[in-house]
């Protein structure tokens, strides 16, 4: 059994732990770790579930050059992940709804996780892929490469209750899907991102993005994340919003907002208010009750109040 402990000094409410099964390469490197029942808080005195030990009795997998080990992992949620098993526990917490996005430290996770070939017989180290393919054919074992990535499909590790997922390849482990969420076939949810309530997702929810209850992400819609382009701002969408088909945002939306189909509103987009004033969209970030549209004759982006509400600028941006 392997044990990973990142901190003994973290407070109980900022710790998590779990018994898991690690896939270990013959050179000692860990490919992945599955935690059937991750827990928050300090670990209890329980021993590893018997079923986990039963899995390890199968011994070495000659096709993949791996074996499984029972691991006991205890982590500090405020510290950065230190190894593969630590990182996988954090991703399990998110997809198991034990932590919401942006509440646990994932700094450096890309450097910790290995890039695996995820196949129908489990993860395989990239250097072993072609040999494993040949060995599988010799053994007449069905063999399909599903994806090559550092992050696996969520449903191969965690299946949250009360959700629908049209294409499992498009939801990464570490996604947070609340009860009542539907991710259609063209939808996508990254790790450390997701929904907090009932939502229809037909577009892309990027890393770090949080979507509120009753909000729909239209087909082909895009929400800027923090993984590409060096962006630091994390986008939050409030309750009861609609991001139209092929629309996109690089600012946060409050509650009851609509971005019309095909309109992409970035932080620097010039927006004309009902009183004729022109502001950067960033000054409206987080504001509620706004309809964003583009005038089809002039191309001007306009913001209109919804439900008899006046548009209010983000006051934080005007404090010196």
Swiss-Prot record:
EC number of this enzyme: 2.3.1.117
Keywords: Acyltransferase, Amino-acid biosynthesis, Cytoplasm, Diaminopimelate biosynthesis, Lysine biosynthesis, Magnesium, Metal-binding, Transferase
Keyword Chloroplast belongs to the record: no
Top-level taxon of origin: Bacteria
Pathway field: Amino-acid biosynthesis; L-lysine biosynthesis via DAP pathway; LL-2,6-diaminopimelate from (S)-tetrahydrodipicolinate (succinylase route): step 1/3
Amino-acid positions noted as binding Mg(2+) 2 in the UniProt annotation, renumbered to this chain: 186
Name this protein carries in UniProt: 2,3,4,5-tetrahydropyridine-2,6-dicarboxylate N-succinyltransferase
Position of the signal peptide: none
Biological function: Catalyzes the conversion of the cyclic tetrahydrodipicolinate (THDP) into the acyclic N-succinyl-L-2-amino-6-oxopimelate using succinyl-CoA.
Residue numbers binding succinyl-CoA: 204, 219, 222, 245, 260-261, 268, 280
Reaction(s) the record says it catalyses: (S)-2,3,4,5-tetrahydrodipicolinate + succinyl-CoA + H2O = (S)-2-succinylamino-6-oxoheptanedioate + CoA
InterPro entries, A to Z: DapD_actinobacteria, Hexapep, THDPS_M, THDPS_M_sf, Trimer_LpxA-like_sf, Type2_DapD
Membrane-spanning parts: none
Binding positions for Mg(2+) 1 per the UniProt entry: 169
A Pfam family this chain is assigned to: THDPS_M
Intracellular or extracellular location(s): Cytoplasm
Gene3D superfamilies reported for this sequence: 3.30.70.2010, Hexapeptide repeat proteins (2.160.10.10), Trimeric LpxA-like enzymes (3.30.60.70)
Active site: 202 (acyl-anhydride intermediate)
Source species of the chain: Cutibacterium acnes (strain DSM 16379 / KPA171202)
């Amino acid at each position: 059994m392997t044990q990973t402990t990142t901190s003994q000094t973290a407070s109980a409410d900022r710790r998590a732990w779990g018994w898991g099964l690690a896939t270990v390469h013959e050179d000692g490197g860990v490919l992945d770790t599955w935690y059937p029942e991750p827990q928050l808080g300090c670990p209890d005195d329980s021993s590893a579930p018997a079923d986990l030990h039963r899995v390890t009795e199968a011994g070495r997998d000659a096709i993949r050059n791996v074996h499984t080990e029972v691991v006991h992992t205890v982590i500090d949620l405020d510290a950065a992940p230190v190894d593969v098993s630590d990182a996988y526990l954090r991703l399990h917490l998110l997809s198991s709804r034990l932590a919401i996005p942006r509440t646990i430290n994932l700094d450096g996770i890309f450097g910790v996780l290995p890039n695996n070939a995820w196949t129908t017989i489990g993860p395989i180290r990239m250097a072993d892929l072609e040999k494993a393919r040949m060995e599988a054919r010799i053994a007449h074992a069905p063999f399909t490469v599903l994806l090559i990535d550092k992050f696996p499909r969520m449903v191969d590790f965690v299946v949250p209750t009360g959700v629908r997922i049209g294409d499992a390849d498009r939801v990464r482990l570490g996604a947070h899907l609340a009860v009542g969420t539907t991710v259609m076939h063209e939808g996508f949810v990254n790790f450390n991102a997701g929904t907090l309530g009932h939502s229809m997702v037909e577009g892309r929810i990027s890393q770090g993005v949080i979507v509120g209850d009753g909000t729909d992400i239209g087909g082909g819609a895009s929400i800027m994340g923090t993984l590409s382009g060096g962006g630091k701002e994390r986008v939050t969408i409030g309750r009861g919003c609609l991001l139209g088909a092929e629309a996109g945002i690089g600012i946060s939306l409050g509650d009851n907002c609509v971005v019309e189909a095909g309109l992409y509103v970035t932080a620097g987009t010039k927006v004309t208010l009902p009183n004729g004033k022109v502001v950067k969209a960033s000054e409206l970030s987080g504001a509620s009750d706004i309809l964003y549209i583009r005038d089809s004759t002039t191309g001007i982006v306009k913001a209109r109040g919804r439900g008899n509400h006046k548009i209010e600028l983000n006051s934080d941006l005007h404090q010196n």
